[in-house]
Amino acid sequence: DLGKGAVPGEKFEEMGRDFEEGLVIAKMLEDAGYDALDADVGCYDSWYWNHPPMYFEEGMYLPFNKRLKEKVSIPVLTAGRMDDPDLAVKAVREGATDLVALARPLMADSFIVEKIRKNRREEIRPCLSCQEGCIGRLKQYLHISCAVNPAACRERELELKPALKPRRIAVIGGGIGGCEAARVLRERGHEVTLYEESGQLGGKMRLAGAPDFKKDDLALVRWYEVQMDRLNIPVHFNTSIQEAEQLKWADAVILASGSGASTFDLGNCI
């Protein structure tokens, strides 16, 4: 239906240009002298295809672009959730695409290509395909950013500079907020110790990553685990901070003990 989406399993007809018409247009563009085709799927009437969110499959343009390559002789570029290095390499090697294009993954981690080249894949900060900082802000006419990398597109303004006076800082809470605070502080040269009441990092992000289409949420948790190891940040698991005396060694304390659920009263409407 025009301008509408559907939930999984719902039957509906998407409006817009169909694939066969797209192939005809692609050939016309090649004949007109185009050097390459950066081909994606969808149009303004089904815009979520252009910027596939988390519930779309990774590499969801590949079946279409593989058929496109059979119709044209110029290079074909493929984007659309192609940030998995193994998927990208396999797609090129198997002839599904000539080049892989990245946009949102570069906002999540601008060094993704360098890390792939140097075989440091575990250090790649994952894109969640959540649309919060990029497409979501763009639709509000705000400067784009990234939910997992607030410095995206503002690298000069938010550059991490060495602290003039390194301090000893305790971070209470090993969720995403606490881990990010610990990481940034350590990158700037502070001495950081992280305390987590449970036996693992990630907090409520682990619950958020329970659906199979949100596995990138768990990948972000894993990324923070790698960062804690890389930066040699001491993490005290199964430790509850109850008294200020426990942290008397610290110059400052950051409380990141977790978020609360938003609730609202529906009254008698159900």
Question: Where do the protein language model's features map onto the residues?
Answer:
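A conserved short coil-to-beta-strand element within the FAD-binding core of flavoproteins
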Residues: 236-248
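Beta1-alpha1 glycine-rich phosphate/pyrophosphate-binding loop at the start
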Residues: 171-238, 262-264
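Flavin-dependent oxidoreductase catalytic cores
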Residues: 1-172, 176-192, 200, 260-265, ...
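Structural alpha-helical scaffold elements that stabilize or flank donor/cofactor-binding regions
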Residues: 93, 227, 245-246
